[in-house]
Amino acid sequence: MEASQVEFEHPRKAFGWAARDSSGLLSPFNFSRRDIGEEDVALEVLYCGICHTDLHMAKNDFGNSIYPYVPGHEVIGIVAEVGSKVEKYKVGDKVGVGYFVESCRSCQNCIDNLENYCPKHILTQGDKHIDGTTTYGGYSDSMVVDEHFVTRIPEGLPLDGCGSSSLCWGYSHSPLKYYGLDKPGLHVGVVGLGGLGHMVAKFAKTHGLKITVISTSPPTKKEEAIKNLGADSFLVSRDPDQMEAPKETLDGIIDTVSADHSIVPLIGLLKSHGKLVLIGAIEKPLELPPFPLILGRKLVGGTLVGGLKETQEMIDFSPKHNVKPEIEVVPMDYVNIAMQRLAKADVKYRFVIDVANTLKPTS
């Protein structure tokens, strides 16, 4: 069920766009941010990527949205102020904020730099902070974040592209690394030709993998996938003949699709001992046939976003290997149209909001 809250007044005035109910429509929203603490950085938001999770949460597809809801967890900003005990950043630094802004810092996951799996992690948007107030995301002019949950953006990286990649870098690479699908010569399928999918394909090629893109997109997208992403082959998932021919040829599959779809045909593409890794947040329960898994010792697993250490490593890795997202930059007042287009997969490959230049305060 959806929930609404009475807005708590913090010291810092802020402005952004928010959904007020499960219609998912966003509109201008005046709110407030907490004051800067000793280990906090305050940042001016420059860019923010639009993720499919933003769309799901705006519409309460997961049943736990809190309104007003300010989306945005692919945030790029410039540090405007630092707390008295901040050590990693200074005013003027370019930084990123991803999917979460707090964790317990004492559980085994946190100790192992896997804060993303901490049972007490706090999401960047639509969650409850330690003080009980709602967290608001990056579709806004400013944020206040503990320095531990901020990543550094190296000089020379295009900041608009980083607005998508602050999440995608860790999210796209983590499943390849954790499931051992980053070894040269392996054949890996990538399901979905969207924001995450195209980055998975790009990272995979840096490891010397053979890549098959699997998509509902028409065959005309084949040349695009091969030319732009370096894919070795392309399958239209709605074509039974195409899905039948390469059965049991893939060492692994990374499924990035958030829309409801069957994974049964994907399991059939896996070799014995193959791994299907889900990173798209599908709303409905999956059909999971046991016999193909048992007889082929196949694995179905999943991953969340990368931890902070891994995400920073991938941010630093990307410019050295020319890995960068392909984006469409849009103004803030285009966000509802962008959401509609995203729902129809009508974007190549990720929307990024130019917050700094297009977010206009209301009186």
Swiss-Prot record:
Cofactor: Zn(2+)
Keywords tagged on the record: Metal-binding, NAD, Oxidoreductase, Zinc
Molecular function terms from GO: mannitol dehydrogenase activity; zinc ion binding
Chemical reaction(s) catalysed: D-mannitol + NAD(+) = D-mannose + NADH + H(+)
EC number in record: 1.1.1.255
EC top class named in words: oxidoreductase
Cross-referenced Gene3D superfamilies: Medium-chain alcohol dehydrogenases, catalytic domain, NAD(P)-binding Rossmann-like Domain
Cofactor binding annotation: Binds 2 Zn(2+) ions per subunit.
PROSITE patterns: ADH_ZINC
GO BP terms in the entry: lignin biosynthetic process
Family to which the UniProt record says this protein belongs: Belongs to the zinc-containing alcohol dehydrogenase family.
Protein name stated in the entry: Probable mannitol dehydrogenase 3
Recorded name of the encoding gene: CAD3
